[in-house]
Amino acid sequence: MKCKRRIDIEKFIFFINLVLLLYCLFSCKTVPTIPEKEINLSREILGKGQLSAVQLADFFITNNEHVEKEFILKFADYYIQEASMENINSDVAFAQMCLETGFLRFGGLVQPDFHNYCGLGAMDAEHPGEKFETEQLGVRAHIQHLQAYATTQDVQLNNQLIDPRYNWVHKTKLVTDIFGLTGTWATDPNYGNKIDEIISRMEVFIKNIKK
């Protein structure tokens, strides 16, 4: 008698579990997944960049693996620090550096020991470009030149001026975004689009590593 009662209880429990399982399969709604937040980097020259030094360095190394990680990490941090001082978008500045130097491969008029990362003054063999003492000062000059393009004459620098061409362009607000650099910073008709393409690659890279 006890054995039969035990079997009946087990059958009852099994039946209840089966009902619950079937209910969940046919009635429970699927919990919606939270959509992945897209990475949209600004193309504006003024403002704060979104990417960290680690993210910038990791992106850079995928395009030039011959540069030491420790160096490019410090170098990327220079861009973030210097850009922050002058309200310049560090993502834009870093992308422009990648374009101008071929991801620090150089190969044109400007040589690596010039510490010139944006082609300042590079015109011909007699004028190969401005030279700066250190990597950080070269980055600072780049940031200052972007600030000169993106602000009016009344906006002053926070760091000491080292860009020798700053006052040539710091009169009126010439540009607001990377596309305005076409025909102003460089004569290349696709200059702004080339920077945009690098920033787009940054967005894809960051999205992929977050998966």
Please annotate each region the language model reported:
Residues K11-L18:
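Sec-dependent signal peptide recognition
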Residues K29-K211:
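Catalytic cores of secreted/periplasmic lytic hydrolases that degrade extracellular macromolecules
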Residues M1-I9:
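N-terminal secretory signal peptides that target proteins for export/translocation
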